[in-house]
Amino acid sequence: MSVSMRDLDPAFQGAGQKAGIEIWRIENFIPTPIPKSSIGKFFTGDSYIVLKTTALKTGALRHDIHYWLGKDTSQDEAGTAAVKTVELDAALGGRAVQYREVQGHETEKFLSYFKPCIIPQEGGVASGFKHVVAEEHITRLFVCRGKHVVHVKEVPFARSSLNHDDIYILDTKSKIFQFNGSNSSIQERAKALEVVQYIKDTYHDGTCEVATVEDGKLMADADSGEFWGFFGGFAPLPRKTANDEDKTYNSDITRLFCVEKGQANPVEGDTLKREMLDTNKCYILDCGIEVFVWMGRTTSLDDRKIASKAAEEMIRSSERPKSQMIRIIEGFETVPFRSKFESWTQETNTTVSEDGRGRVAALLQRQGVNVRGLMKAAPPKEEPQVFIDCTGNLQVWRVNGQAKTLLQAADHSKFYSGDCYVFQYSYPGEEKEEVLIGTWFGKQSVEEERGSAVSMASKMVESMKFVPAQARIYEGKEPIQFFVIMQSFIVFKGGISSGYKKYIAEKEVDDDTYNENGVALFRIQGSGPENMQAIQVDPVAASLNSSYYYILHNDSSVFTWAGNLSTATDQELAERQLDLIKPNQQSRAQKEGSESEQFWELLGGKAEYSSQKLTKEPERDPHLFSCTFTKEVLKVTEIYNFTQDDLMTEDIFIIDCHSEIFVWVGQEVVPKNKLLALTIGEKFIEKDSLLEKLSPEAPIYVIMEGGEPSFFTRFFTSWDSSKSAMHGNSFQRKLKIVKNGGTPVADKPKRRTPASYGGRASVPDKSQQRSRSMSFSPDRVRVRGRSPAFNALAATFESQNARNLSTPPPVVRKLYPRSVTPDSSKFAPAPKSSAIASRSALFEKIPPQEPSIPKPVKASPKTPESPAPESNSKEQEEKKENDKEEGSMSSRIESLTIQEDAKEGVEDEEDLPAHPYDRLKTTSTDPVSDIDVTRREAYLSSEEFKEKFGMTKEAFYKLPKWKQNKFKMAVQLF
């Protein structure tokens, strides 16, 4: 559609350029912008245009346009608003969805912009009304309807307005009463309290009293007596009588009309199909309660205005005041519209393939052309933000039939594609220790063991009182949280579980389980040492990809293969994975285009292969749904512009961000549905409410109220954990907040979750724990290649057998400040004086240590201390002393870090005395004294150094520190 700027109203210039809400009021047929201070105020005699601009994850802006018609607005103003909305859409590029909003029948999406409610005021521009603050407060009665958003309507202040089904708010001069009809739900009552808070803040400066009255309690308390006194005393309420607002319209019958020359002509057809819509025309789809206007991409601005008028007339003539009109442009159809059609092929974004570039580059390289410039890969996409601490404790079990086997620490990250696993990960959260219990299903695993794994994980969660989060993960669909937990993750072909062995025996298929002496090919992927994977693939040339590094081995040879589009990071990860897959064999490097014959022989010869990097489902903008699950039927309702307050403790909610599904379960949900939370998540994927072709293997998380981890709360603009620490149902909690001036009051401290599952002890055995990498300060700059001295010190703080990585783990960003409650000081953990003192003493002397479980060291902001009584003065002195020691320890660590970073990469130029290898190695029975134990190799003679390391000292010190450490460990000099 080509549009001249002369056809567009100048009031819309520059509109929709940034996220937010913009509103115009129709004044003398001209859209006039209203100031930000007036956003949310509507007058019954006016018509408005509301533009909501949303910034999407893709960086694009989405526009939704609503035109709101007050109950007393004139037909001319309403018509102007409808036409100007079409012009605004044209000014924005013709992509916006347009909604007709009638006072009292607004869409939930529209009301979500103005939470908790809108209360239109009498008057308007046409009547010359000027808003003046009344000197005397007028007693008003409002009816509230809605479970997720609230429709508020002022009704006559009379007993006849009340009924048992709705909730009413009586706003008097000194007190606000909420009357809860006996047939209203807890959720509706809780939402109505948000309106009470709004009225209290807006019309009473937040100072008046609030009271609730329960329908049927007669004169049980003073508040009830006072409430009924305004109505002349108590009397039974009449039954609700049906009126025009309560009429329902058949939405099962849908009719399609084509608009030509201002007339809506029926389109014949038994079923609706996408092919019925012509891009050169406009159509009306009448669904009773909803009327859609579909406008082809090539239609003119006048055609669109005419179609909109025809739809308005259709609604008006059939007397359907509640019907909503939605106008959509071809290519930007909404989910409700597309769902009316039998088949609708949704356009997908095409990705540019790297195949052509890779093949041409490889051909040129074989012809002797320098392809260095051609081989530069496209800028890497930003790595997803990590929202989980990776310094926690991990336990992993392999499922064998109906039983599970605990894995040794060395095997925690080595999975088989034919097996299922259960894992438990305990880690420091923002306010308490958090636990994630999950299952991982290999692609070749059997259904029986998958069911066993889910049952085992669910029982673990249930035994811990539903505090941990639960995850269901499939091979190939792992989220970033899982990879960060596992760190060096390897997936082998085949399996060793009883279920897998039984399956291949019954099916009489070959067992391709990984054999370290056989031919195996691994694809290396990841973003760094804390997130790297080696995936075993078929040992054939077609499995190669120019964007990756590979490891290929048989019983006697090891090759690394570098694709032309791979990076230096990929090379580093391949070197690290070699340490795990083939630690004792020297590898031979192969570059794409210059491979040896032996390399191709192991792969069975050359073949065509891809060069396009494998991509995972991207995370999309989150959508929140409220769920009801009865008789195996799942019903969902989308909550727009959601906040934490939309989560009701009696209900189950789902956040859908396409790549992952989060099922949130309130504390007051019935026990039966708590146990079915994972099933509800699976049913949601099957339902595919957004028609986005959700993968049935998408990760599902089950999150219990009160145990929300950071990777869940990140979807909310703010999060207050004290709200879930309150007792009672949603209504009782909201009432406490309203009566407390809008501040949540925690009834009890959060329970600290146990560190592990099973047995009598809550702490796992050290032998079964994998030592984790750790970061000494969450605010430290990322340091590459820590030196042996620093690594040795870090190892002391973790455990004696700690595994050293070259980089600290990713820092988990604190999303929200800790919630402050009147009793928060009571919940703060006690200072670990003895631990700090003992660790500080390590700098002078390291005494023999008893076996202990490695615990993460995590810096946390200091909290103000409340003054203690005089009797505790001795304890205060001890605490001050310990704080000094802690500060000293931190400063020494930072100082050492700076010194070691400065030494990074410095060659050995000192004139040190030479000592024999037998006296320098760590296991020596006659060790040399007075040497730097972090540089034992420097005291070797040049000849013995070359014999042990296979290189000169000069070449050795040019290697990165992590590689130096690897060589030193191999010869017992580290």
Curated annotation (Swiss-Prot):
Disruption phenotype: No changes in the primary root length, but shorter root hairs. Increased sensitivity to latrunculin B (LatB) and instability of actin filaments. Pfam families: Gelsolin, VHP. GO terms for biological process: actin crosslink formation; actin filament capping; actin filament depolymerization; actin filament organization; actin filament severing; cytoplasmic streaming; root hair elongation. Gelsolin-like repeats lie at residues 29-79, 150-190, 262-305, 394-451, 532-572, 634-675. CDD domains: gelsolin_S1_like (cd11290), gelsolin_S2_like (cd11289), gelsolin_S3_like (cd11292), gelsolin_S4_like (cd11293), gelsolin_S5_like (cd11288), gelsolin_S6_like (cd11291). GO terms for molecular function: actin filament binding; mRNA binding. Residues 888-898 have a biased composition (Polar residues). GO terms for cellular component: cytoplasm; cytoskeleton; plasma membrane. Residues 909-974 form the HP domain. The keyword Repeat applies. SMART domains: GEL, VHP. Keywords: Actin capping, Actin-binding, Calcium, Cytoplasm, Cytoskeleton, Phosphoprotein, Repeat. PANTHER family: VILLIN, VILLIN-4. Belongs to the villin/gelsolin family. This is Villin-4. It comes from Arabidopsis thaliana. The lineage of its organism: Eukaryota, Viridiplantae, Streptophyta, Embryophyta, Tracheophyta.
